[in-house]
Amino acid sequence: PNIPGIYGLEKALQFIEETGVKEIQAHTNMLHQRFLEGLYEIQGKNLIRIPGKEGRENSGVVSIDFCTMDNALVCNRLASRYGIMIRQGLHCAPIAHQCFGTEKSGTVRFSFGFFNRMEEIDRTLLAIQEILS
C-alpha cells in the first residue's frame, strides 16, 4: 500500500476540514479576480486573448493566448527570468483548443491556490507586461 500517499491524503483532508472549503474558495476567487483585472488592462492593447468564459465559477485556472509572441517563449521567459512556473500547450484538451482556435500554439495556463499570495499575482502581471513591452 502507498502509505505516504494515504498519509498525505489524510493531512490534505484534515487541512480542508480545518480551513473550510468556503475560505479556500474565497481566497482562490480573490486571486483569480485580481489576475483577470490585470489581464483585462493588457488585453485592451490586443496583446493577449483569454479564451473561454471568464464569468463562470472558477477553479483558479486561467489560460491565455499571447497574440504577439509565441506562447512557449512567454512560458520559458516567465520561468527563466522571473521564476514563475506555469504550463504551455494543449493541457490534455485538444478539442477544447480547436473550439477556441488555439490548437496550433495552445495557451499558457496559470493556476492559483490557497497558498498563493496577492503579491505573487501582482508580480506575475508585472512580469507579463515587461515581457510584452
Q: Predicted regions span which residues?
A:
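Pyridoxal 5′-phosphate
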Residues: P1-S133
